[in-house]
């Protein structure tokens, strides 16, 4: 399956039409990671976002020298999306949980897409805002549960 078709069938990109996925596919690169390999380290450069085609990715955060898995990302889902928006260092690490194939979108390529097809780029930002909002809501729920047990 080609990149544009994969994106078109991906529920995360359901708001994109064929023309949008065609444009987006031109700025995607396919990358492969072996199980256990680091995709990006915590505090590493925030220069790409990723969409999982196959495999899985563990998002980990180091707390007091202990690496904790905070999320497992599966095919069709994305991670590292804050890099497209702010370019800041990574807040967590990403490691392949299995042999994994991802599509990556670099910040530079996204900037080029914004210039070439601004409507598509705006739709992508809308998608990322929804994803980040959902993750923030979940983090708030998790904090509520933690604070209940601490009190």
For each feature predicted by the language model, list its residue ranges:
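Cytosolic regulatory regions built on CNB/CRP/Popeye-like sensor folds
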Residues: 1-151
């Amino acid at each position: 399956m080609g990149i544009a078709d994969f994106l078109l069938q991906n529920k995360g990109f359901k708001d994109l039409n064929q023309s949008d996925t065609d444009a987006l596919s031109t700025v995607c690169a396919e990358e492969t990671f072996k199980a256990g390999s680091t995709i990006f380290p915590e505090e590493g450069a925030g220069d790409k976002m990723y969409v999982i085609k196959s495999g899985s990715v563990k998002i980990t955060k180091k707390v007091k020298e202990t690496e904790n898995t905070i999320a497992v990302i599966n095919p069709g889902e994305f991670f590292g999306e804050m890099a497209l928006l702010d370019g800041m260092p990574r807040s967590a690490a990403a490691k392949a949980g299995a042999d994994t194939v991802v599509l990556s979108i670099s910040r530079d390529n996204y900037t080029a897409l914004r210039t070439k097809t601004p409507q598509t780029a705006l739709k992508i930002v809308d998608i990322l805002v929804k994803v980040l909002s959902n993750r923030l809501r979940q983090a708030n729920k998790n904090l509520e549960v933690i604070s209940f047990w601490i009190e």
